[in-house]
Amino acid sequence: YWLSSLIGSQETADGYSKLIEDSKTIFYTFPESVPVYSAATEMAEGFTPFNDIQKQNAIAVLKHIETVTALSFVPTSEALESNTLVFALNTQEEDSYAYAYLPEIHPLGSDIYMAIHPTNETMSVGTEGALTLIHEIGHALGLKHPHEEAEGLGEVSVLPADEDSVANTVMSYEESTVENFKFEFGHLDIAALHYIYGPNPNARASDDTYEISSTQTNFIWDGAGVDTVDASKLETGVTFHLTPGHHDFVG
């Protein structure tokens, strides 16, 4: 259910994956003027390019994503191509900090518009703008809000209230604190991105050992190798599944 709460359906995940085919490449651009396909839309209102600091921070998020997924991000000057993240600012409603479009074949897919607002002045780590930025990039890669039902799936596509927090997923609206104002996806976000695009095959590629902790969440992912999950230091039993779709637990 934690995948359904961020992606929706298998069909949705397959659709996003097929957009990039086998290349695992997504392009990104910071246009100096509004893209032609958005010129007559609300996106053009107050259109403002990213400044250098904002560009650096957006690229830093993409670099983080490359470390945990099989995706590669390549700069381009062409916003019209599909599979392209377009970053810009514009004028939005008073209560809106940003919005982004889910991936699709139309060039508008994966476009990200940050509001011209003090929150988004730099989008640097330690500011609320950092969380807003990575949240919108999550949308542009196919992630939804965990509290919103996916069409036709009902409650199975909603994260339980006790798990719906920014500590688990940056796509959440709940329990946001300064500790979450960073360029790192939560463990549920990473699981969802792995499901769509696959893990980075070069990360954790050795024969690794993962020790299970009884005091914190154990989230394990691995790129390759013959790996070991070690619970020998625990004083209580462990319920552990090797099949997908389970929450394992200690005690």
Region locations from a protein language model:
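The catalytic-center signature of Zn2+-dependent metalloproteases
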Residues: 88-107, 127-186
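Acidic, glycine-rich low-complexity segments
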Residues: 22, 152-174, 179, 183-251
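Surface-exposed patches in mature extracellular/periplasmic domains of secreted proteins
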Residues: 2-8, 12-17, 68-80, 147-151, ...
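Short, well-structured beta-strand/strand-turn elements
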Residues: 63-85, 95-106, 112, 121-122, ...
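Active-site scaffold of zinc-dependent metalloenzymes
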Residues: 26-40, 99-125, 170-174
